[in-house]
Amino acid sequence: MRRGFYIGRFQPYHMGHHLVLEQISREVDEIIVGIGTAQISHTVTDPFTAGERIAMIYGALRELGRWFYIIPLPDINRNAVWVSHVKSMTPPFEVVYSNNPLVVELFMEAGMEVRRPPMYRREVYSGTVIRRLMIEGGDWRQLVPDAVAKVIDEIKGVERLRNISKKDFA
Amino acid sequence: MRRGFYIGRFQPYHMGHHLVLEQISREVDEIIVGIGTAQISHTVTDPFTAGERIAMIYGALRELGRWFYIIPLPDINRNAVWVSHVKSMTPPFEVVYSNNPLVVELFMEAGMEVRRPPMYRREVYSGTVIRRLMIEGGDWRQLVPDAVAKVIDEIKGVERLRNISKKDFA
Amino acid sequence: MRRGFYIGRFQPYHMGHHLVLEQISREVDEIIVGIGTAQISHTVTDPFTAGERIAMIYGALRELGRWFYIIPLPDINRNAVWVSHVKSMTPPFEVVYSNNPLVVELFMEAGMEVRRPPMYRREVYSGTVIRRLMIEGGDWRQLVPDAVAKVIDEIKGVERLRNISKKDFA
Amino acid sequence: MRRGFYIGRFQPYHMGHHLVLEQISREVDEIIVGIGTAQISHTVTDPFTAGERIAMIYGALRELGRWFYIIPLPDINRNAVWVSHVKSMTPPFEVVYSNNPLVVELFMEAGMEVRRPPMYRREVYSGTVIRRLMIEGGDWRQLVPDAVAKVIDEIKGVERLRNISKKDFA
Amino acid sequence: MRRGFYIGRFQPYHMGHHLVLEQISREVDEIIVGIGTAQISHTVTDPFTAGERIAMIYGALRELGRWFYIIPLPDINRNAVWVSHVKSMTPPFEVVYSNNPLVVELFMEAGMEVRRPPMYRREVYSGTVIRRLMIEGGDWRQLVPDAVAKVIDEIKGVERLRNISKKDFA
Amino acid sequence: MRRGFYIGRFQPYHMGHHLVLEQISREVDEIIVGIGTAQISHTVTDPFTAGERIAMIYGALRELGRWFYIIPLPDINRNAVWVSHVKSMTPPFEVVYSNNPLVVELFMEAGMEVRRPPMYRREVYSGTVIRRLMIEGGDWRQLVPDAVAKVIDEIKGVERLRNISKKDFA
């Protein structure tokens, strides 16, 4: 049995993440999805809570009919203990999937196998692009799985993001 | 759609928990299992990491063929914000299942519906009893689902518990 | 102008505290009341939130027609920086009133003047006694100022304390 | 009885805040003034400690002859629990006064009534403007209540701000 | 080059520690002394600050004419990341010396070599015994190196310990 | 006996620091070197752990044949208690050496003597310059003591810094 670990902030979970997970699911038996910066929400770059992100990812993955672990990971703000932190919050895994240079370096220093997943249509499958479309009224729905759009609608996520991105005159 | 929330420390997950979850699963559509005191491990009362507890519960629930959310919840050490903390880390839920007086009080003050699940064979389906059996070499395996015993064996959990429960002469 | 500093947990604020503050108010121009362990609530020894304790003390002192500073002080869990912590959260003061050995030692080491206030009817003007009376249905109202009893009633404080002091069978 | 909650960083408290509080005091019975980011001081944007800010505001409000609650609120760095955090540190309140988009959003999501107070002479009644005048030797005194200027002088606040705004050649 | 790691709370550093370090110094080239629970002081079980403990140990070891690393280690309160925490605060080391069951278990799980140092006159070379002698006026000086007694006298350590061990009547 | 306190982040320790310490060592009997921001590593501005920085400084100072205290100081993120924090982690000292405006201000407000050490060849004896040379493949070795270069090589510090400074396309 072989488990892979994939981490992201998922603000929100989009088709780029989804295509990577489909790819990874062909290489390992089980996938652990770590939700990074889990403690932050209601900011312009991190609008959604960990619970909301779990609901998004869970909905998208359930459609695939596969078992996944979806685990919120609060920041620990000490890179030197971060790998231990992740390991203590997850079932054992053998391979890490990441393109983030810091994540790659930390797991490599810890002696783990790290693979770089392919990146799909990076110019639109991007949290930054999607959040900007949400604020400006563009078409973000086509960039995320349907189950994700459904969650964002239920929590009034676009309204929240627009409100908190207003200028503060205080 | 109706979700129920059930929280415990699960040190370890045992048949008492399992029977409650089977009961709850007949009352709601989806169950969120919160792993309390997620940040603590390697102590006599809390020997297992959150990741190890996730593996135990996941194994036991997968055998049931049902979807569950299993979410580690680190202590926040401020009861007055604890309900908000839980809500931010979980998908929305409508009913709480707990017999813990503090959990009941906090969710009641927050205006949530709280139900008391039945408790099964409390004299043996008990984390305290099971950990003592582990230390003393008793038969703890019959008190937990098979998938849980398998995880505890893989991580050498009994050996760990015995080691850390030795007297400190320092 | 001369300010005095008086600290307590005030779980709840009672006539013993009140008599001390009346005494202190004859010695200094302004009194700063520090609410210790401000972050804790909903426990058997610390049932009330900082906000609830502020409301209690404020009500009791307003009846006296005097100006007071009432300042919540979260624990910092590092005694060596605690005096700096207190000073950073309060207007400047010249004298400390306390009978707590640790508070006395920390302010003495910091070179501050410390006075021991008289203690009144210690066998009943005591948070421990009052909380026990609340749980057991005894007459706690005569031991606190009227304004305090009013706040405790409004927040259903006795019911909360009784609920959280129930035995946990989980 | 109706209480209003007004929050700011008050670095320093100025006439813009003061005019808002005068306005609010006509709408509610009691005002709770929350001092945000209470734990930070000695920086270019947040030069004053919570205790110093309490002294400033207290002095200004006492001149009005009204009762106010002035409560330091340390950051909790988790927006999703911030409203609970505020509520646990304050007496109960019914209406929030704020123009800060995040504060507005968080209290709105919590189902509270939020009002936008008028803003007065925003181009000069501004902490940023006042701190710049302090550094550059301009006339900041006319922009704050007399009691505030007195506190700033006593703590040598302008000297502190100038010192810490020097370039670091280290 | 081979480094050994030895950890204790050193409240205070006594002849038992000293004899162990002399023993260890014959087995490795360099010794790293970790001061555990570095953030705590002014309590009955942990009266001395990390800085005071560094001064004690430094004085005792300098008399030996050997190079040592003396490193304060604040508690991190998460056993699962503790080894990473220690490693990030220390130069690389190859062998751990400890009789503490938890320390032994954590380093063993991390795959490190752990040795049990001999324990000398455990009935008197004991922090608990020495602190009790300090409180009761017994002869503690013969149980610590001279340099340690000198530091304790300079900081008035015995007076502090007696003061904070008084009963709290508050 | 007179001790001086010198603080820096030492990312990495370089000849500028070394020349200052040589200068200070002529003015005081013992030097305490505080390693600031000790908890941070593996970032572009703070690549090295506290333990790695201790090894660097220790190696450089041992060549001088002098006794030094080298003490990691985690950030406390509350300037108003920072001086107390430093004092609790260090042996007593009488004079502070710093050119950092905030450090100077905080120790001055605490009534300590502060001296400004001379700065040597600031245009190259600079952590920023040295880290940029490391990334770009320039000659950084001549700017640090030999013992420091040796440690950086052993931990593959340049490779780490280059890896984590790559652009994140995630």
UniProtKB/Swiss-Prot annotation, chains A, B, C, D, E, F:
Its main location: cytoplasm. One of its GO terms (molecular function) is ATP binding. One of its GO terms (cellular component) is cytoplasm. It holds the Pfam family CTP_transf_like. Keywords: ATP-binding, Cytoplasm, NAD, Nucleotide-binding, Nucleotidyltransferase, Pyridine nucleotide biosynthesis, Transferase. Its EC number is 2.7.7.1. InterPro entries: Cyt_trans-like, NMN_Atrans_arc, Rossmann-like_a/b/a_fold. It is an enzyme of class 2 (transferase). It catalyses: beta-nicotinamide D-ribonucleotide + ATP + H(+) = diphosphate + NAD(+). The keyword Transmembrane helix does not apply. Pathway: Cofactor biosynthesis; NAD(+) biosynthesis; NAD(+) from nicotinamide D-ribonucleotide: step 1/1. GO terms for biological process: NAD biosynthetic process. Belongs to the archaeal NMN adenylyltransferase family. This is Nicotinamide-nucleotide adenylyltransferase. It comes from Methanothrix thermoacetophila (strain DSM 6194 / JCM 14653 / NBRC 101360 / PT) (Methanosaeta thermophila).
